Each structure stands twice: as C-alpha cells, then as structure tokens.
Amino acid sequence: MATKPVVKEKKKLENKKEIYKLIEHNDSSNKNVILEKEEELICPMCGSKNIIKDYERAEIVCETCGCVLQQNLFDVGPEWRAFDHEQRVKRSRVGPPMTYTIHDKGLSTVIDWRNKDSYGKDISADKRAQLYRLRKWQRRIRVSDASERNLAFALSELDRIASKLGLPRNVRENAAVLYRGAVEKGLIRGRSIEGVAAAALYAACRRCKVPRTLDEIAEGSRVDRKEIGRTYRFISRELNIRLTPTNPIDYVPRFASELKLPGEVESKAISILQKANEKGLTSGRGPTGVAAAAIYIASVLHGTRRTQREVADVAGVTEVTIRNRYKELTEHLDIDVTL
C-alpha cells in the first residue's frame, strides 16, 4: 500500500514530457550561476512544483527537497557572455548582425584573401588561379548594378567621415538609414553623393545627441560647409526629420575632455548652462560659443584656467565670440569672476 503514491507520482512524471526537453538558454550574462525555474515539472519525492535547472552543475533539481531529477543536462546556450542586448546581438553565433552601413546589409559572403586551405596549408598554383577568378566574380555579384555601386560608394564615404570624426556605431547606422531613405525617395538626383552622405551624417549626429558642427563635418568630408547645410535642410524637409535645436550642454563633455579639464569643471559648466537656459540666454546664439564661454568661466572659477585661445581652438569659434558670451553669462547670472 505504501508504494501507491510513488507509482502515482511516477505516472505524473511520465506524463510531463517537458522534463526531458532542452530549453534554449539565451541569457548568458550570469552563466556561472544559472537557476531556471520550470513550473510544469513535479518532484516524484515530495510533489513540489518548485523545480529549477542548474546549468552550473548540469542538473534538474527540486528546490524544496533537493531531489535530483536529471543529471548531465546539456546547456544549449552560447559559450560567450553578454551584458546587454547590443552585445548579445553582436555575439550571436548565427553570423554577424545585420548592418545598414554595408550596401547589402552584411548578408552576402566574401571569399577570404588568404590562399590557404582549411588546415592552413598553401594551395597549389591551379587552385590559386581558380580562387582569383572566384573572388573577382564574387565582387561583381555583390555589386550588380549602378545603383548598388553608388550606394556602396556612399556608405564607404559615410564610414570614412565617421571614422575621421570618431563617431560611434549608432550614429553610423542612423546616418546609413537616412541615406537609404533619401535614395528611395529619389533625393540624390542632381546632388553629389558626398554631399548627401555628409548631410545624413550631420543629421544623425543631431538625432543621436552626439553633436558635431557643420565645420567639423565639412573638414572630414570633401564638401564645403554651405553645400552640406543646404543639402541637410533639403533632406530634413523631404524626409520629415524633426530635430530640436542643439543644446550647448551636449558639447561640454567633448570640449572639457579635449581641454583635459577635471569633472568638477565640466559639472560647473553644465550648471551655468542650465541656469542660462532658464533665463533664455542660449536661444538665438551659437551653441558652441555659449558652451565654450561656460567652460571658460568654470575653468577660471575652479582654478584650472584655460586661455580663451585654447578654448576657442577646441570649440571652433573665435575669441571675440567667447568674450561676448562670457560677458552675457557673467552679467545676467551674477557670476563674480576674478581674472
């Protein structure tokens, strides 16, 4: 009679096929101690549904009584660790992530340039000639028509400018999406590819709160400032891009870093700009000039003074602009600066 409950529980366990199913484990950020709950399983010893999967010990265990339901559990999760979604996408073992910065979105294949086999040994002369022809045709297949060639050139130009300016990956992706949108709407006709690429990059910088001036974009590209500004206004209107005015605060971290100023000076400059914004002192004025003046004032107040020439060179403005903004900020915010 004492064996009936055990037999009954065994029947329940047999009906629960999930106990022997492997569940894909995608979250590997805490792979050393992974305990995965499984509500559908029932412990045959105590009847508890509090079952966990311990991937560190490769066991399915009842958390209530400690009974081991299964050993040698396979961990089908990735062998790498990721701490956010972006890392998880990048490290996926199903191939490189899709990217808009490549004309084919990174979905095509490339024949490696090394003339070696899978064992690392040199291949014969006949095979090398064959690989040379295959590589040539592979390149032709990847870029099949004129529109794809133009797109490939534009995206390479965009990546070149972004690399020169040290822009992050999200800005490059955003700029590539904007450029593709301009191509789809036929906005490239009558305009230079370099000009549209530079304008898309400028718009992406403003979108992603990584501000760069038109002068900086023009310096990195082969297009003058006036053409970039004109093209930027055109594609913004046609693509219905809504961008708020650039905040001077967005420039402070970069300027302070280039001037090698401590964090206290950066915080003080941001505080000055916040007060200036509340009083309307930043509207109608160039954001770089206002940010430069705030950094200059903060550096003097904290005893780590930088000259107006040094600040002007980093901000890309004139010393006269800094002096004018300096007078406005000190007078309206009642800042006592001893020079």
From Swiss-Prot:
Sequence repeats: 156-239, 250-331
GO biological process: transcription preinitiation complex assembly
Record-listed Zn(2+) binding positions: 43, 46, 62, 65
Alphabetical list of CDD domains matching this protein: CYCLIN_TFIIB_archaea_like_rpt1, CYCLIN_TFIIB_archaea_like_rpt2
UniProt keyword Transcription regulation present: yes
Residues passing through the membrane, by range: none
Function, as annotated: Stabilizes TBP binding to an archaeal box-A promoter. Also responsible for recruiting RNA polymerase II to the pre-initiation complex (DNA-TBP-TFIIB).
GO molecular function list: DNA-binding transcription factor activity; TBP-class protein binding; zinc ion binding
Keywords: Metal-binding, Repeat, Transcription, Transcription regulation, Zinc, Zinc-finger
Annotated InterPro entries: Cyclin-like_dom (IPR013763), Cyclin-like_sf (IPR036915), TFIIB (IPR000812), TFIIB_arc (IPR023484), TFIIB_CS (IPR023486), TFIIB_cyclin (IPR013150), Znf_TFIIB (IPR013137)
Zinc finger feature spans (TFIIB-type): 39-70
Pfam families xref list: TFIIB (PF00382), Zn_Ribbon_TF (PF08271)
Family: Belongs to the TFIIB family.
Gene3D superfamilies found in the cross-reference section: 1.10.472.170, Cyclin-like
Protein name per the record: Transcription initiation factor IIB
Claim: RNA-binding is one of the keywords in the record: no
Source organism: Methanothermococcus thermolithotrophicus (Methanococcus thermolithotrophicus)
